[in-house]
């Protein structure tokens, strides 16, 4: 009896499981059917949307094409839009070139008194006040030359200033002579005396530019022509790139740059004045010589000029700092006038720059001392050292063999 009851219970349990599985399958099938219906509805809705959009676009396009006024207005609008975009692009480029030509400093310019955009943004008050408070300076202020050369450069300064006042054509000048004789300083003073801007470039910067040299040269003169005050363009070491094209071995890029320079300086201008400085003017191309109006020789200072230079630099680098008391520097008591004359006699053959370096060495020697006092003996030691260095440099320059004190003992 119990066995039949157990079998009956098992059969009922199996029946219940089958019923549950059947219901579960029905639920799964119902979910699948609903999902399939949802996908079909979404697909049908998407297709209907595409058909409606296509119909709407087609009808709109058909209406647009058949309406001549709308077509004309659209074409005109697109044309104006294209012209506007093209004009804006080119106007931006032109504006950039204009700003660069007017205010940007060319890559060849090492130093200039013209106000650049960067300097104006960094120090606007300082730049404006410098321009408003600037006054013409004496062309020979801080420049020591022989009496004949002083008269010559003063005449040039008067001529240049009057040319600027009367808006005449500037003359091209060649300053030649040994290095350190005051050519660059005179060019700066000439610009300030005449109320002009100045720009300094060096000939050694041209050759490394290669193919960019021609473009840089044209940018330089385009920039020079925009100066309202007139520009004095000073080319230091001009012989570095203005060499003879017929005999010198120069690259094609440098030759093209030289041709561009000759083209821009072939005629006189009321916008810029050209000053060339060279230690070897005999190396110039003949076309450069034809462009030069005035030649001025800056020679080494004589004994009288050296005495003036020694006094000037002694005052600038030693006496003035010592009297101000702001630095650790004092000067012993001795006859300064006699010492300046003695030093002028010993420094024969030295340039203005060398004498300035000698005065700087006096200052450095005083700073190196324990008490900061520059004595006469310390000055004499510096002078003797500079004289020996100058003699050695002259031996190198002349190609002479070193003296007995420099020769090595034979083995």
Curated annotation (Swiss-Prot):
Keyword hit for Nucleotide-binding: yes
Cysteines engaged in disulfide bonds, as pairs: none
Keyword Ubl conjugation: no
Residues annotated as binding ATP: 177-184
Keywords noted in UniProt: ATP-binding, Nucleotide-binding
Any one Gene Ontology BP term: mitochondrion organization
Residues of the signal peptide: none
Gene3D superfamilies cross-referenced by the UniProt entry: P-loop containing nucleotide triphosphate hydrolases (3.40.50.300)
GO terms of molecular function: ATP binding; ATP hydrolysis activity
InterPro entries, alphabetized: AAA+_ATPase (IPR003593), ATAD3_N (IPR021911), ATPase_AAA_core (IPR003959), P-loop_NTPase (IPR027417)
GO cellular component: mitochondrion
Similarity-based family: Belongs to the AAA ATPase family.
Protein name: ATPase family AAA domain-containing protein 3C
Organism: Homo sapiens
Gene: ATAD3C
